[in-house]
């Protein structure tokens, strides 16, 4: 046993220090980025935000809506091959360019993903997702996926430390998904005591990944547009959002009514709700590591997407970054004990 003495930080622990700017308007900021990925060789351009691969966020409907904003969607792994085929038959090439195919690490998951990718060559992204990316089995699966799909861009996670980020990149991942426990409906940290404050994880993993020519996506911990800006400022190439995109018409959650008001269910993918729905319940040897919440219906996701992108543009203007690409270089974080004046937050 040992204790690391250096303090690790989350998004709530910092603010971005403003700097002189020559920008005249938020409209001058370019949020689109262009990436060429280490192994696939694919070049992609768009806004590097990803809707999370949760079945109450990463739906086909979400992909259709967010493609209009140049945003990616990691479509959840619980759609059947037949449902994928129906979606592909109606989706435009531009929508498919903004879709990631999610998979687990079982043999059945692999075979299903093979079938889905064979439906259309425009499906260029694979998101290999497990809660704990530290297992040898997971690393071996990433290597297997790279061998099977040499021209696909592979995103793999989740991890939170530089050395594991490096191992996944060396095993074939183009992008490493970073985050253990920061999600709004994740309870891993309280159930297990395991985790890592998200901003520090992003900073450390970005440094490790970029040294090898890889990239990272910050997954979890964002509660507002300012957190998205902080994730990019900390070095994230992509930012994945779950709770911020939940509760919308396109989110796919079940709608319930209480006292005449309608709510949408949103749950973590290791929650009892998710396991009851997809694997017949919580196995005797494990505990649920997620919760279920009821969110007031939030209407079309487009309004939220515009708010997030607007906040991101504004953050760039405050530090003089004319392009999102410049935000990291122009970010100085300051440690704080307050974020906002909360006097009217309860109203």
Curated annotation (Swiss-Prot):
Belongs to the IMPDH/GMPR family. GuaC type 1 subfamily. One of its GO terms (cellular component) is cytosol. It holds the Pfam family IMPDH. It comes from Salmonella paratyphi C (strain RKS4594). InterPro entries: Aldolase_TIM, GMP_reductase, GMPR, IMP_DH/GMP_Rdtase_CS, IMP_DH_GMPRt. K(+) binds at residues 181, 183. NADP(+) binds at residues 108-131, 216-239. HAMAP family: GMP_reduct_type1. It is an enzyme of class 1 (oxidoreductase). The lineage of its organism: Bacteria, Pseudomonadati, Pseudomonadota, Gammaproteobacteria, Enterobacterales. This is GMP reductase. Its EC number is 1.7.1.7. Homotetramer. Keywords: Metal-binding, NADP, Oxidoreductase, Potassium. The keyword NADP applies. It comes from the Bacteria. The gene is guaC. It catalyses: IMP + NH4(+) + NADP(+) = GMP + NADPH + 2 H(+). One of its GO terms (biological process) is purine nucleotide metabolic process. CDD domains: IMPDH (cd00381). Disulfide bonds: none annotated. Catalyzes the irreversible NADPH-dependent deamination of GMP to IMP. It functions in the conversion of nucleobase, nucleoside and nucleotide derivatives of G to A nucleotides, and in maintaining the intracellular balance of A and G nucleotides. The active site is at residue 186. One of its GO terms (molecular function) is metal ion binding.
């Amino acid at each position: 046993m040992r204790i690391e003495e250096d303090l690790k930080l989350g998004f709530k622990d910092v603010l971005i220090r403003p700097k002189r700017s020559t920008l005249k308007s938020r409209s001058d900021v370019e949020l689109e980025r262009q990436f060429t990925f280490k192994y696939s060789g694919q070049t992609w351009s768009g806004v590097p935000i990803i809707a999370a691969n949760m079945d109450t966020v990463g739906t086909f409907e979400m992909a259709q809506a967010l493609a209009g904003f140049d945003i990616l969607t990691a479509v959840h792994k619980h759609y059947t091959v037949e449902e994928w085929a129906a979606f592909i038959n109606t989706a435009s090439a531009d929508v498919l360019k903004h879709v990631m195919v999610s998979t687990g690490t079982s043999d059945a998951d692999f075979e299903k993903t093979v079938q889905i990718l064979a439906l259309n060559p425009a499906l260029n992204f694979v998101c290999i997702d497990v809660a704990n990316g530290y297992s040898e089995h997971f690393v071996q699966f990433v290597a297997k996926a790279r061998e099977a799909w040499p021209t696909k861009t592979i995103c793999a996670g989740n991890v939170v430390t530089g050395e594991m980020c490096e191992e996944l990149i060396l095993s074939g991942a183009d992008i490493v998904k970073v985050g253990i426990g920061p999600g709004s409906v994740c309870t891993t940290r309280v159930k297990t005591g395991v985790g890592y404050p998200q901003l520090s994880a992003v900073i450390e993993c970005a440094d490790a990944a970029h040294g090898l020519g890889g990239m990272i996506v910050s997954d979890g911990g964002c509660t507002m547009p300012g957190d998205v800006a902080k994730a990019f400022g900390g070095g994230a190439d992509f930012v994945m959002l779950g709770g911020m995109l939940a509760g919308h018409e396109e989110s796919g959650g079940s709608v319930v009514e209480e006292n005449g008001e309608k709510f949408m269910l949103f749950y973590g993918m290791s929650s009892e709700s998710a396991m009851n729905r997809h694997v017949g319940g919580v196995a005797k040897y494990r505990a649920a590591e997620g919760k279920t919440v009821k969110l007031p219906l939030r209407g079309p996701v487009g309004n939220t997407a515009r708010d997030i992108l607007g906040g991101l543009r504004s953050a760039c203007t405050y530090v003089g970054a004319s392009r999102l690409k410049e935000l990291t270089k122009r970010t100085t974080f300051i440690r704080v004990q307050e974020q906002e004046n909360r006097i009217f937050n309860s109203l």
